């Protein structure tokens, strides 16, 4: 039993509340336990210079954290005048994950700009951000189609992410901050609804792991990703390749 009462292979309670903000084309508030992230998707009628004239779109992402999202206040990166390496890494990870999910040639020469803002952090902020960002992006694409701006809903697959780690020689799913701080091995995995993996980040902290442990961690991550995607699926109706929103505004793993 873990400090928060979960089993080793158990996710924290997860909830997704769509349309959390009024103005973006897509938005949600996603919670992984105490970790809470606002994810938005904004449609910009432009693409980077290197894509102009090529007839395809782009998806990019920004990630930030409120100063008091953590137990001790952190200084805003905008005040420091630079974005840290961790933030750059997470932003790129979110962007890559979203581009895995969408056929960019079918959204026209426009950019979907994803913003993920952590309002409370207790571990797993990047995996929560990716899982929530998919909902924001999918809702934005459905809105574009409904308004007749694009001809299809070019969403290729669901995408979600989860953390796995080795803590006190035990392999655990969806680490909270306490567990993440003590982890011998930390892994973040991004996967799709078809069971494929799009990104795996793994590193040991003064600890080397075996191939058998790696496989066990990947298997556990796949279990968590499957559960997250089952939750995402409740928000959509898919028929003959066409995506529409379901009537649900909020889904939770506890209901």
Curated annotation (Swiss-Prot):
Keyword line: Nucleotidyltransferase, RNA-binding, rRNA processing, Transferase, tRNA processing, tRNA-binding
Role summary: Phosphorolytic 3'-5' exoribonuclease that plays an important role in tRNA 3'-end maturation. Removes nucleotide residues following the 3'-CCA terminus of tRNAs; can also add nucleotides to the ends of RNA molecules by using nucleoside diphosphates as substrates, but this may not be physiologically important. Probably plays a role in initiation of 16S rRNA degradation (leading to ribosome degradation) during starvation.
Domain of life: Bacteria
Gene: rph
Transmembrane segments: none
Pfam family, one: RNase_PH_C
InterPro entries for the chain: ExoRNase_PH_dom1, ExoRNase_PH_dom2, ExoRNase_PH_dom2_sf, PNPase/RNase_PH_dom_sf, Ribosomal_Su5_D2-typ_SF, RNase_PH, RNase_PH_bac-type, RNase_PH_CS
Molecular function GO terms recorded: 3'-5'-RNA exonuclease activity; RNA binding; tRNA binding; tRNA nucleotidyltransferase activity
Keyword rRNA processing: yes
Coiled-coil ranges per UniProt: none
Protein name stated in the entry: Ribonuclease PH
Family recorded in the similarity comment: Belongs to the RNase PH family.
Enzyme class label: transferase
Entry keyword Transferase: yes
Phenotype upon changing residue 86 to A: No processing of pre-tRNA-CCA-N(8), binds tRNA as well as wild-type
